[in-house]
Amino acid sequence: MSILWQSSLYAFGFYVALNALILLVLGVLVTRARVVTKTDIGDSGKPEMARPLRAHANNAEWTPMALLLMWTLATPIGTSIWLIHGIGVPLTLGRILHAIGLSSNAGPSALRFAGMVLTWIAYIVGIVGVFWLVFTPQSPAS
């Protein structure tokens, strides 16, 4: 059995690493666009900078809170590993789809839309899970 199915913390770490990799790739794409357009700070009014900047920024805006929700659920002993994967899979897939959709299309995009819906699903699962954890009577730790 894979270690990803043995521990909520290992599964959480896996999704942190995957989402850090996504952010790194998006950051490299911004740097590449800066080199190509000779842009130092911001977008310098160059429209070709808008999509890579927004793809990176959008990921940086949405991913941390979802990972924090996941961490809140991964740390208590006995939290279902399915809950961690129920947040991690849609979050990671959603962030990838959104970045591809935003990077490849200036206008509306089905991939971008699907990515946001999956990200919202991850948020909803995480929010409900944390509320359940907080408001459900737990047995005291021994």
Regions found by a protein language model. Give the residues of each.
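Short alpha-helical packing/oligomerization segments
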Residues: 72-93
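Short, strongly hydrophobic alpha-helical membrane anchors
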Residues: 1-7, 139-142
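Physicochemical signature of membrane-embedded alpha-helices that form the seven-helix bundle of GPCRs
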Residues: 15-18, 53-56, 83, 87-90, ...
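Juxtamembrane boundary at the C-terminal end of a transmembrane helix
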Residues: 128-142
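Cytosolic, membrane-interface loops and tails of multi-pass inner-membrane proteins
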Residues: 28-54
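Core segments of transmembrane alpha-helices
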Residues: 58-71, 123-124
